[in-house]
Amino acid sequence: DAIYRNSAQDYKQFQLVSNLDAKISKSVRFSLDILGRQEQRKRGIYSTPYLFTYFLSTFPGSAPYYPNGLPRVGYDGITRNAAIMVTDLPGSNNYTNNILNIKPLLHIDLDFITEGLYAEGYAAIDYTFSDGKQINQPYDLYYYDNATQEYQNKRSDTGQISLNDWATRYSTITLNGRIGYERTFNDVHKVNAFVAYEQSKYNYHTLSGYRTNFLSNTLMDLFAGSDVPADKDNGGYSDATARVNFFGRVNYSYKDKYLAEVTMRYDGSMNFAPGHRWGLFPSFSLGWVMSEEKFFEPVKPYVDFLKLKASWGQMGNDNISAYQYLSQYAFTGTGAYFGSGDGAALNKGFYLTRTANPLVTWETANTTNLGFSASFLNGMFSLDFDWFKSKRRDILITRSASIPTYSGLVLPAENLGKVNNSGVEIVASYRDRAGDFEWGITGNFTYAENKVVYMDEAVATPEWQRTTGNPIDGLVLYKALGIYQSQEQVDNTPHMDNAAPGDLIYQDTNGDGTITWDDAIRLNESATPKIVYGFTLNGSWKGLDLNVFFQGQAKAVQLVQPTMNMVTDFYEGRWRTENTPEENLNARWPKAFIKQTYGDTWNGSASTWWLRNAAFLRLKSVEIGYTLPKAWTSKIGIQRWRFYVNGNNLFTFDKMKICDPEVGTSKDDNGYAINSNGILAYPLQRMITFGTNITF
């Protein structure tokens, strides 16, 4: 597998799986699952999201090579030549992951005490050992010097040979034990209950060494690097977290008609200070199978199943930065000199990076759900409907907005934030057959939206920019009203400095006669879709089978600001002085401009002009298969033999065309955002797969 013609990427995996199931006695069962895996990865020093950002942000006229074959400098005038960055010329990143998962489980039936009683316990042990080397090295890039008419090598600007050698180990050990009871009384009362205890502990440790100024890249070990203090560095980091959970559930049904369930959790986390570590989280649900009632019998030929359901539950979240109840300090490499002459010495010191909050505790989510499940005409049609509303409370946020930075305070996170989520989920299906032909369709539809109830905001924040009352990730940008057609229109309209015909017109939201960031507005829309849907079509006939899956979204927007390597869509239909007045009046884009970071402060700003409807319907997958007749395969000892061809991401119906409407923020290997422009995101891949399945 590769998506680059010449690249440094390579991946190998070796895996060993063992599953042992043993029935020791009539009442005792034991299982042991073992998974061992080694991953050997090799790539260049630049991750794929970064590479695609550079591919798509290179100036159109900046070819990677000169006509004589010499690699040229990138658009920054130094090193960013994406055609070289995919190779191992700038260096390599080689690492190995050794993964071991072990899960022994013991189940004991305790029917000799009372029927339906059992005990069960398991241990899940997950270990990962990783080590790797990242090597950076200088490489040849050239630029043409018009003065000397010679190609100048910029190798000296691409860095020195350096090595980062690291090793990491982390483990998660989980112990789980439960006592359960499952029994039916008089064929009408069904009870299923258990109480359980679980504890888990996570440990992480990494150690790294850095050296530079190697004489060559022949021997890349730490001892071969420079011994000058400025050319070397060592580092290490450890982390640990743990949880203890007591939980239980009681499920009861009467004649499979009246259903009730109660779940309780009592969870403790070391992420919180003593006195705030424990949280009690209950949940309740009720169900009524109305179709089992006698009064329902007249409609049973049409509605064979109808169940009403309702639930309420509370969940806790401790997935936060650990030890926020402790103050955090960092050691700086700078400080004050004390003494004079040869006796002067640099005294390094600590500085506060986080103030302790001893009251930090669980974030909570209270969720209410109402719905029904139904099937019609002996299962030919089925329908599931759920309405939900979730109130997230005690979300950790800081008061950094309402307390100005000049206060000098390093503020802690506090359990202050409030967000509401609500929506509906619908799943419907239809199936039928005629002779040897079977077919069916299943569709799902989800509408969900969120609204910030409370978020700390500066008092001076304009009402039209506030987060409160809007989605969490609502976009803030200028509202574009059109394109300036004449200098007279510019002079009579609030505008930024140096605005001219062909530039975008922005709304003066606060009415002060000037355009500043205070005029930007917060939208009730974002790249997160409010509507997600999909449907699957399937059918089979005499060994042939077909499965088609469509996926889509709606009520989402994508910001597609132009970048340096503007796609053709941004070029065609733009405002130009050479156009007729009618052409400019209907221009799709403002006049050509230099990107904001290179001088433009007007057209390149985030605005509704660059906002596009991100709704789409995608043919996500199609699979066609054929199963050979059993009469043929049984003669050669094969129980079932199927051939198939599968296609993924085959085509998409959308109005964007500029980029994939589903992409959002590109992220690097560590999950940090690289850009929020859909044009620069890693594209989806269309894949065609041929295969066969053989069962003996």
Model-derived features: positions:
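Conserved small-residue
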Residues: 208, 324, 414, 433-527, ...
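Small-side-chain secondary-structure face that scaffolds active or pore-lining regions
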Residues: 2-15, 41-48, 99-101, 111-217, ...
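Outer-membrane beta-barrel proteins
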Residues: 1-31, 41-45, 81-98, 162-172, ...
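Short loop/turn motifs that connect adjacent beta-strands in outer-membrane beta-barrel proteins
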Residues: 27, 109-119, 184-191, 257, ...
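Outer-membrane beta-barrel signature, preferentially recognizing the C-terminal barrel domain
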Residues: 228-247, 336-382, 411-434, 471-477, ...
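Extracytoplasmic gating/loop element in the C-terminal half of outer-membrane beta-barrel translocons
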Residues: 65-66, 70, 78, 269, ...
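Flexible loop and strand-edge segments within Gram-negative outer membrane beta-barrel domains
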Residues: 1, 6-82, 91-98, 168-170, ...
